[in-house]
From Swiss-Prot:
Originating organism: Lachnospira eligens (strain ATCC 27750 / DSM 3376 / VPI C15-48 / C15-B4)
Keywords, sorted A to Z: Aminoacyl-tRNA synthetase, ATP-binding, Cytoplasm, Ligase, Nucleotide-binding, Protein biosynthesis
UniProt GO MF annotations: ATP binding; catalytic activity, acting on a protein; proline-tRNA ligase activity; transferase activity
Recorded catalytic activity of this chain's protein: tRNA(Pro) + L-proline + ATP = L-prolyl-tRNA(Pro) + AMP + diphosphate
E.C. designation(s): 6.1.1.15
Top-level taxon of origin: Bacteria
Protein name: Proline--tRNA ligase
Primary gene name: proS
Amino acid sequence: MAEDKKLVEAITSMKEDFAQWYTDVCKKAELMSYSSVKGCMIFKPAGYAIWENIKNEMDRRFKETGVENVYLPMFIPESLLEVEKDHVEGFAPEVAWVTYGGLNPLQERMCVRPTSETLFCDFYKDEIQSYRDLPKVYNQWCSVVRWEKETRPFLRSREFLWQEGHTAHATAEEAEARTQQMLNLYADFCEEVLAIPVIKGRKTDKEKFAGAEATYTIEALMHDGKALQSGTSHNFGDGFAKAFGIQYTDKDNKLKYVHQTSWGTTTRLIGAVIMTHGDDSGLVLPPKVAPVQVDVIPIMQKKAGVLDKAYEVGQALKAAGLRVKVDDSDKNPGWKFSEQEMRGIPVRVEMGPRDIEANQAVIVRRDTREKITVSIDELADRIPEILDTIQKDMLERARAHREAHTYTALNYDEFKDTAANKAGFIKAMWCGDQACEDKIKEDTTCTSRCMPFAQEKLSDVCVCCGKPAKAMVYWGKAY
């Protein structure tokens, strides 16, 4: 039995050290490994398969709203990056530069894209001439480079995978509608696919994207009580259009500037899944995103007929549309159970000679470890139902955790005490002054996460300065 436990013994307890627990899970579940390039990581098959499932489902949802995929170069000339001053100032500290082409110095250095607003603007300048060319609703799946000082697998790395949508519209109203539409798409995706509840809201001016008129965000609460920004949608107004000269002729033959949006999510969604649902045995994956949904584990598989029945069950489950693995390795059952739990496979099916003789199998849920004995003939019908239940239960548990770790502060002493002694979101009123936002961060390390669309009037005054309040804000320590 000691050998069976090696997989889980290697994981640090969440309560002992959450950061180390997270790293242990990433490595032991074989999601990633570290690269020889500092600050970069290697996606192993198990980790990349999760990203593929995220990408495929999100891309399907994008296309239902009229999004088309494109791909633009990864290099941006310095002169192009500097066209929009607020934008370049926001990214300058993180930019990686290419100064040589082979052995020859470049006449103009190129940055490796930290984001692609400037490239899309340069592209749209030539693509858009008339109102008939609008709207443009493009997205690209790619990697970007930001020279981060502190990195952590999936959450923050110097190169990461993401999608970035860039759109151009004839009117401000159309741009705002698209901005909100994509934020809602992200929120629905997180809740329906990743089983992660999110708060939708608007960023403060201090926290909004460089060059945007407004930034909207979805904020999730991790198991350790820290917030994770899980997707953003930006309304650029006509600021970038004026900087780059993106104009169109309207129906009255008048020249007008387009209105633009940008929206994106990244592989930090994988980190969000790990930190929302995982436990001390490893990953707990929502069925809709799990690369393998069912692990069929034959017990005493060398006995006549056991392995054949396991293969037969595996084929029946695949025919029912499930992602299935039959673990026919020569490891003992205890080791296989530990590995299945470590990898977060939502359901395992245990079957040995006595089970087969009785025409039954045991289904074990990864999230609750509940055991359900089912007729082998009913597995293909029952398991999809159980997976649906797991998906719903995981969302409800995550929502209950968030509600239990969301606090209200009506004065500054209460705010500071909550920030010092409790982990989670703090709801508090704010006057709209950046000085108060800065003071709260300096005193408590809490940042404004968002001004939620669902506003509550907790009091009439700012929690920090006592002046009249303008909005209720979610505050928290964040990744």
